[in-house]
């Protein structure tokens, strides 16, 4: 049966308590903004900010229930997640609550996920793309029976549950790596050396004029941007590409496995290593990145990576940040070379790596499996939602 998208759910608006009222903030109620759920995972469990009951009662924000869906509606449009427990949210998002008897909460999540591209095409606004209430009125969807909805949601949820499990395991593995670094780096009073002393090379990405949209091609050498550096290791969702001939002219900005890539403008503080077994043999940086190639006769790149994810490493890196305008690190290559860290003897590092490398390998295996599961899920999604794959004979 056909419905307007607005007819299958209740649309709930968010809000922000007054920031001038400290009694409204840092309470027990999670308060969502898009940065909390833009990672592609189905559920959102943590928020950067929290509010108090007084903040909830004295603002236009609302409390979403378990199973409700949240969607970003302004600026970064179309990020979605399911709410696992009550959370409030800001005015740049909508809460979507399934209407009983028409759709289930699980099916609504996948219905919205399937229609994100349609929602984006129906945005409004001259400055920022914005999803409005009218957007949902203008989209028509075919809704199957509740029984069919439950079957479809169950199939897709199996993939998301495994993806969530892999993510939880990997978060635990990162905690182990961080602890191993802290224990090793503080075990003795190791000699301090500067990055300049342990680096084989520190170099910048190209000037912006050397890589622009007009130079992109369908395949070739992938360009690394901040979107690929959100964790400890290079993430490979999708790329823009330049030709090999073009990349050859940018040799100073080419990076390889074991190089550590940093962001110096925008999301400063990012530091990710290109792992062994990555998708491509080499990459080119965008203009907002720079990189460190370690002298492996002196230091293990894994050790340096974990240093820059420690509190001390982040403090050292961000101490060179400009305090005005767009967040950026001043003279990134020069200042990176000045940063000092404790360097154990390479013989001790090799013993440490015997413990660390299997953990990294497990992390990468989980990451690759998650990529495969995500591709399978996203391939099945349109086929299931359109009815191309018939689930009527499937028993649960």
Residue ranges and their predicted role:
Residues 112, 116, 120, 160, ...:
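Short amphipathic alpha-helical signal-transduction/dimerization elements
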Residues 1-15, 138-207, 343-391:
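Non-catalytic DNA-recognition/assembly elements of restriction-modification systems
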Residues 33-34, 47-113, 225-226, 246-313, ...:
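A short beta-sheet element
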Residues 3-22, 35-66, 196-213, 227-263, ...:
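Sequence-specific dsDNA recognition surfaces
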Residues 73, 87-94, 127-153, 282-290, ...:
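A short glycine-rich beta-alpha junction/loop motif
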């Amino acid at each position: 049966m056909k419905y307007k998208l607005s007819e299958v759910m209740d649309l709930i608006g968010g809000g922000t308590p007054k920031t001038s009222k400290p009694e409204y903030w840092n309470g027990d109620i999670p308060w969502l903004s898009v940065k909390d759920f833009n990672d592609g995972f189905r559920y959102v469990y943590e928020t950067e900010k929290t509010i108090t009951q007084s903040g909830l009662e004295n603002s236009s924000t609302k409390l979403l229930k378990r199973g409700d869906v949240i969607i970003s509606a302004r600026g970064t449009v179309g990020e979605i997640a399911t709410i696992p427990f009550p959370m409030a949210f800001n005015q740049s998002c909508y809460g979507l609550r399934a209407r009983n008897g028409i759709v289930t909460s699980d099916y609504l999540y996948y219905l919205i996920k399937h229609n994100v591209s349609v929602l984006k095409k129906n945005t409004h606004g001259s400055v920022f793309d914005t999803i409005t209430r009218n957007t949902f009125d203008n989209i028509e969807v075919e809704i199957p029976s509740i029984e069919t909805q439950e079957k479809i949601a169950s199939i897709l949820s199996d993939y998301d549950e495994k993806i969530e499990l892999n993510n939880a395991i990997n978060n635990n593995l990162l905690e182990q790596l961080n602890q191993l670094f802290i224990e090793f780096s503080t075990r003795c009073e190791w000699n301090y050396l500067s990055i300049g002393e342990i680096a084989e090379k520190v170099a910048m990405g190209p000037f912006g004029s050397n890589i622009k949209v007009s130079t992109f091609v369908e395949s070739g050498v992938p360009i690394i941007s901040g979107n690929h550096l959100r964790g400890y290791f290079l993430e490979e969702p999708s790329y823009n590409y330049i030709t090999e001939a073009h990349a050859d002219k940018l040799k100073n900005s080419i990076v390889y496995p074991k190089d550590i890539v940093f962001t110096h403008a925008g999301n400063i503080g990012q530091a990710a290593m290109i792992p062994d077994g990555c998708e491509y043999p080499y990459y080119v940086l965008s203009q907002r990145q720079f990189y460190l190639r370690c002298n492996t006769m002196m230091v293990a790149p894994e050790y340096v990576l974990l240093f820059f994810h420690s509190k001390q490493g982040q403090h050292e890196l961000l101490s060179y940040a400009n305090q005005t305008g767009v967040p950026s690190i001043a003279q990134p290559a020069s200042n990176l070379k000045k940063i000092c860290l404790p360097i154990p003897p390479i013989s001790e590092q090799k013993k440490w790596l015997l413990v660390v490398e299997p953990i990294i390998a497990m992390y990468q295996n989980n990451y690759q499996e998650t990529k495969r599961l995500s591709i399978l899920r996203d391939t099945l999604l349109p086929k299931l939602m359109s009815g191309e794959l018939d689930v009527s004979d499937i028993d649960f």
